[in-house]
């Protein structure tokens, strides 16, 4: 009897098994929402919305209508009457949770979601956070760092409210955070860090001043953060962590589109460092050729042009990508899928750590960047050979400057361009 029953049970196809894997991931992510108590993680609730909804979108799954409506309504209650989004209803508005809330609403898409953002009040909040030295405060009397610059500039760019007043001196502040290693720190004098490096680089691109950074040295620093375990570390001599698949991998993805500026800086540097002009300097710069550019700083744009910078985010992913990946994309996919992935859903820092919403979001974002890193256009389907595992592993493409799914970004860009 048992043998007969077993014989009648159909063997699942490869496609069915792959679909079950995707469904288990999506089910796990939905369960994360269902199991969050009302008072849990109250100061980062917009981040929980972003991490979870962005992960679902990356997996190519639609958002449940009730979940979408509840999320928009909740984020409306987090929106401060004077602009910006707080970590929860009635709390202080904060640039980080503003970024998370706006990215969530963009990912949900649709008029109700996008129109819920009070752009005028939000602009006023950003102006209040802007500092004379070019930096931004995260909140009233809060810290001033590169993360604040990125979250403000990113939100202003995607909402089509970026202007000269918000841009003024931002490039100077970020430039002062580039360290002797090449990466960027959170503030002047601190240690280079993967998260701040992505934030600073992305912000400089969005304000049209990326040529002021020492890009060859920055590239040197980032590519050497990919460790023998195949993942990325956040700082020199630290352990690899799955979340840096996006923070460092995203920085490399941005640099991949800046190859012409990198080539120009290296060519210009070679004119300064010669045997006759600087023999002592040349002796101590044997490590890599990009070290020769450490003293080069292009002036960039002294006065920003609002009509140009408002379209930088859109134009950045409209151009064809000329160079191949600048990191080992297959190796990073191996780390994400084999080391960071939990067998029953969710992703983590590394084996032995617990899965969580944050790492699930940024591991998946990094995986998407890897999969499309060989494509000339950001939404061109990659060849199967550059996608580790079955082709059903392929995620949705993201906009590398904003970390939102590409088609949702385009919808938001069209919506806000008409306002």
Curated annotation (Swiss-Prot):
(2E,6E)-farnesyl diphosphate binds at residues 193-196, 235-238, 244-247. Binds 1 zinc ion per subunit. GO terms for biological process: protein farnesylation. It catalyses: L-cysteinyl-[protein] + (2E,6E)-farnesyl diphosphate = S-(2E,6E)-farnesyl-L-cysteinyl-[protein] + diphosphate. The record marks 47 as: Important for selectivity against geranylgeranyl diphosphate. CDD domains: FTase (cd02893). GO terms for cellular component: protein farnesyltransferase complex. It comes from the Eukaryota. GO terms for molecular function: protein farnesyltransferase activity; zinc ion binding. Heterodimer of FTA and FTB. Belongs to the protein prenyltransferase subunit beta family. This is Protein farnesyltransferase subunit beta. It comes from Pisum sativum (Garden pea). The lineage of its organism: Eukaryota, Viridiplantae, Streptophyta, Embryophyta, Tracheophyta.
């Amino acid at each position: 009897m048992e043998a007969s029953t077993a014989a009648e049970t159909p063997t699942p196809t490869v496609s069915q098994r792959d679909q079950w894997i995707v469904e288990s991931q999506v089910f796990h992510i939905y369960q994360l929402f269902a199991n969050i108590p009302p008072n849990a993680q109250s100061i980062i609730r917009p981040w929980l919305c972003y991490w979870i909804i962005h992960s679902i979108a990356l997996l190519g799954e639609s958002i449940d209508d009730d979940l979408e409506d509840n999320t928009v309504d909740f984020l409306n209650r987090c929106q401060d009457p004077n602009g910006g989004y707080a970590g929860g209803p009635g709390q202080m508005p904060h640039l980080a949770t503003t970024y998370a809330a706006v990215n969530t609403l963009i990912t949900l898409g649709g008029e109700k979601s996008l129109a819920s953002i009070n752009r005028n009040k939000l602009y006023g909040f950003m102006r209040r956070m802007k500092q004379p030295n070019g930096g931004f405060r995260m909140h009233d009397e809060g810290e001033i760092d590169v993360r604040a610059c990125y979250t403000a500039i990113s939100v202003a760019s995607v909402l089509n409210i970026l202007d000269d007043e918000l841009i003024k001196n931002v490039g100077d502040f970020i430039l002062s955070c580039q360290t002797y290693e090449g990466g960027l720190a959170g503030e002047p004098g601190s240690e280079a860090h993967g998260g701040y490096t992505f934030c600073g680089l992305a912000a400089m691109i969005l304000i049209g001043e990326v040529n002021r950074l020492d890009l060859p040295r920055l590239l040197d620093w980032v590519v050497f953060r990919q460790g023998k375990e195949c993942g990325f570390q956040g700082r020199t001599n630290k352990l690899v962590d799955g979340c840096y698949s996006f923070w460092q991998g995203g920085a490399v993805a941005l640099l991949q589109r800046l190859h012409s500026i990198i080539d120009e800086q290296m060519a210009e540097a070679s004119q300064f460092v010669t045997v006759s002009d600087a023999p002592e300097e040349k002796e101590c710069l044997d490590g890599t050729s990009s070290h020769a550019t450490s003293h080069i700083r292009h002036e960039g744009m002294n006065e920003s042009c609002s009509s140009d910078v408002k379209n930088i985010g859109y134009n950045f992913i409209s151009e064809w990508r000329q160079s191949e990946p600048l990191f080992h994309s297959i190796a990073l996919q191996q780390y994400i899928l084999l080391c960071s992935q939990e067998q029953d859903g969710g992703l983590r820092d590394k084996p032995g750590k617990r899965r969580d919403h944050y790492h699930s979001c940024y591991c998946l974002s990094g995986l998407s960047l890897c999969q499309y890193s060989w494509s000339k256009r950001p939404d061109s389907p990659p060849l199967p050979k550059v996608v580790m595992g079955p082709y059903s592993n392929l995620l949705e493409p993201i906009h590398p400057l904003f970390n939102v799914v590409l088609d949702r970004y385009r919808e938001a860009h069209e919506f806000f361009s008409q306002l």
